[in-house]
From Swiss-Prot:
GO terms for cellular component: cytosol. It comes from the Archaea. Pfam families: Trp_syntA (PF00290). The lineage of its organism: Archaea, Methanobacteriati, Methanobacteriota, Stenosarchaea group, Halobacteria. Pathway: Amino-acid biosynthesis; L-tryptophan biosynthesis; L-tryptophan from chorismate: step 5/5. The keyword Kinase does not apply. Belongs to the TrpA family. Disruption phenotype: Auxotrophic for tryptophan. This is Tryptophan synthase alpha chain. It is an enzyme of class 4 (lyase). InterPro entries: Aldolase_TIM (IPR013785), RibuloseP-bd_barrel (IPR011060), Trp_synthase_alpha_AS (IPR018204), Trp_synthase_suA (IPR002028).
Amino acid sequence: MSLEDAFSDGPAFVPYLAAGDPDYESSLEYVEALERGGADVIELGLPFSEPIAEGPTIQNAVVRSLEGGMTPTRFFEFVEDLDVSVPLVCMTYYNLIYRYGDEPGPRPFVEKAAEVGIEGFVVPDLPAEEAGPLREACDEFGLDLVFIVAPTTRGERLDRIMEQVSGYVYVQARLGTTGAQSSVSDQTDSSLERLTDYDVPKAVGFGISDGDHAERIVASGADGIIVGSALVDIVAEGHENGDDAETVADRLETLARELEDGAVAGASQRPPHPERT
């Protein structure tokens, strides 16, 4: 299933977890729990030591994953060991992509990602202006390249991003780094309005933490929701409390179902989405 196909039957729920957080085996269980909870696409974080786009919650997840031995090679093994059927997106930083393999450049990393079943990438530190080599490699191996659009992104820069993006566009619901919030930013509506004329699914992320958030965002016109910190919080709490992996996985599945149900409820409050051509 392609990423765009995952958005074709209603709002897509796109959860994020850092691969290997807090350890390899538990993390496999947690990611698989997200699919049981209704995930349509799963973003897997390949940890980098300087995650500039992340708030404290995901930064701590990155630390736990790195301390557990996660590397690009181990990440690809992790993807192969997963028992899921939904599309997987690798969220990582360009340094790791560029330096993988015997020669610098993105092609070896993208080739390996395609081999193990990754469908696309989110690379927060890679501007659209510098994405040409990665875009070419993704085109060669049939992978998507997702870009993040901030509330301040407009004009020529927005056009440049939307020329490069495929799969879906990651719409930042507010300014700043990632993290679960108690309310939804009013910038969400204006961000979605700016993207109306672009024919690519729009998934809103940054700060979504419950079903009410999901419902409001989808009712506002989003094609999907991206949720990270609220789920990573569950992993962190379970790790700190010494809870067993099955218990934590059950909590993740419960929140995933709430978020998915919220998204579906939001879709029922808006006119049918026009067919994409």
